A protein has these predicted regions:
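Structural motif
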Residues: 88-90, 164, 191
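Sec-dependent N-terminal signal peptides
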Residues: 19-29
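C-terminal, surface-exposed recognition/capping segments
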Residues: 39-49, 161-162, 169-234
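Short, Lys/Arg-enriched N-terminal segments with co-localized hydrophobic residues
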Residues: 1-15
Length: 234
């Protein structure tokens, strides 16, 4: 028995030791190989959103899957509705009407942009002008509080993001055409939504219901209370 134990220690333990060392080396090599995989390179085995979460560049994604494949995807707090094919900038939007209909704000004369991408600048401009005493301007009056669409959006912190704004009329139309028309997004067809586009005393608004001027912005009234679409770009 002692002799058998001797042979067990001499012959079996070194074999087990070698097996263990071999497995350890293999594990290290495998781990190193995994560490060398660049997750920021487009991986066709992953979804587009998974690639986005891995910080794959937008331009690489466009080259791999095409620009339109990104429309309607939920990412970055909203649904992608515009992609800049030169810079890779994304614009996303979502419904924020859970708070109910909200006012436009003070009544005053102002012109703001209508093209895609104008929303952030226009939202800030509207908030700045609301800070003035608009009871003194021709045809103007004071709303009387900060509980109005553009201030709400600019101050909002939602899903870890604090750079929200009200999109322009052109952006609302792009949201309708690139997202809502394909059954994506969370936009309410029963609501009229504010845009950040204004022509003089007339703010532009839009329905998402095809039977009621759906997808086409039109002049509304600052006296109304409407729903909110909020957007961000990054």
């Amino acid at each position: 028995k002692i002799k058998n134990l001797y042979f067990c220690f001499i012959y079996q333990f070194p074999i087990m030791k070698n097996i263990f060392l071999s497995m350890l080396v293999l594990a290290i090599i495998t781990s190193c190989s995994k560490d060398q995989v660049d997750l920021t390179v487009f991986n066709p085995e992953l979804t587009i959103v998974e690639n986005l979460n891995n910080d794959v560049s937008i331009l690489d994604l466009i080259e791999a899957v095409g620009l339109e494949a990104l429309y309607g995807l939920e990412f970055g707090g909203g649904f992608i509705f515009n992609v800049n094919s030169t810079s890779g900038e994304l614009m996303v939007a979502r419904d924020y009407s859970i708070i109910g209909g909200v006012a436009w704000g003070d009544h005053f004369d102002l012109n703001t942009g209508s093209t895609i991408g104008d929303g952030l600048e226009s939202t800030q401009l509207i908030v700045d002008r609301n800070a003035d005493d608009n009871s003194l301007v021709l045809g103007g009056f004071e709303f009387g509080s900060d509980n109005y669409a553009f201030k709400i959006a600019l101050d909002l912190e939602l899903d870890g993001f604090d750079d929200w704004f009200i999109p322009s009329s052109g952006s609302l139309e792009a949201i309708y055409n690139n997202v809502h028309m394909y059954g994506e997004g969370d936009f309410d067809e029963s609501l009229i939504y504010w845009s950040s586009t204004k022509d003089g005393y007339f703010p532009y608004v839009m329905f998402f219901n095809f039977e009621s001027w759906g997808g086409q912005a039109f002049a509304g009234s600052c006296l109304d209370a409407n729903g909110l679409v909020i957007a961000r770009k990054f």
